[in-house]
């Protein structure tokens, strides 16, 4: 993997064939979780130093080819393990659509799709068996897709922004967590620059992960009142 790549993914989930047919026959990839994370596409655009950033629902017919290209990038494939034909990515999207604690989004800068996101309730995920989870912990996965966008600090800017958006939208959430592979040095550095701290390593079924945490600050806690 190139040190300029940024990606992080959770442990594998089983494919749900019946649900795929139902979900992907719809106009867009429906958010799985009711509540704040399911409304991320309605959070609106936020101005950042790198452009105006916004999250959007994934439309499989429109977005599958793009995501397939990103996942087959040699710098990305070892970390996300979704290389192959479009069916591999389609099944992954279908799985994200049917699990009730996770939501997948396309992230845009100035209306250009440049990132793939998974926001999920970490306390309801298999990950919770491997670390001291707290109620309403939110997990985050990010892939910066275009190679030209990597290695320029964009990933850390986006991670910081999305963590802040999550904490603003979900007042019961006190922590945003991530579990990148310990070998993914670019991802670890991006999370650190975005304000996440390394809370130790955890052994997951498919990797040794660095547990990265971004806790709600005192100022953000005051804003909840």
Describe each model-derived feature in a short phrase.
Residues 176-188, 205:
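Conserved beta-strand-loop-alpha-helix junction that forms the acyl-donor binding cleft
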Residues 151-166, 189, 193:
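Conserved acetyl-CoA-binding loop-helix of GNAT-fold acetyltransferases
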Residues 94-139, 147:
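Acetyl-CoA-dependent GNAT
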Residues 69-83:
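Helix-loop element at the rim of GNAT/NAT acetyltransferase active sites that forms part
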Residues 2-61, 221-224:
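Conserved N-terminal entry element of GNAT/NAT acetyltransferase domains
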Residues 167-168, 179:
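Intrinsically disordered, low-complexity, charge-dense segments enriched in Lys/Arg
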Residues 67, 140:
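Hydrophobic pocket/interface hotspot
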Residues 136, 204-225:
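C-terminal "cap" of GNAT-fold acetyltransferases
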């Amino acid at each position: 993997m190139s040190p300029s790549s940024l990606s992080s993914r959770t442990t594998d989930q089983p494919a749900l064939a019946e649900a795929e047919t139902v979900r992907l026959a719809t106009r867009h990839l429906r958010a799985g979780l009711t509540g704040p994370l399911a409304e991320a596409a309605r959070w609106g655009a936020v101005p950042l130093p790198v452009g105006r950033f916004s999250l959007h629902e994934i439309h499989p017919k429109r977005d599958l080819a793009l995501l397939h290209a990103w996942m087959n990038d040699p710098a990305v494939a070892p970390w996300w393990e979704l290389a192959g034909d479009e069916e591999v990515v389609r099944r992954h999207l279908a799985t994200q659509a049917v699990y009730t604690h996770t939501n997948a989004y396309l992230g845009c800068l100035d209306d250009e799709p440049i990132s793939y996101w998974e926001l999920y309730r970490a306390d309801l995920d298999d990950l919770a068996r491997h670390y001291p989870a707290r109620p309403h912990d939110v997990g985050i996965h990010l892939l910066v897709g275009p190679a030209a966008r990597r290695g320029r600090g964009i990933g850390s800017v986006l991670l910081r922004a999305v963590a802040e958006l999550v904490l603003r939208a979900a007042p019961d959430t006190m922590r945003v967590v991530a579990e990148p592979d310990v070998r993914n040095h670019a991802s670890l550095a991006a999370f650190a620059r975005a304000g996440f701290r390394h809370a130790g390593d955890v052994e997951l079924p498919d990797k040794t992960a660095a547990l990265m945490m971004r806790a709600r600050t005192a100022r953000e806690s005051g804003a909840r009142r």
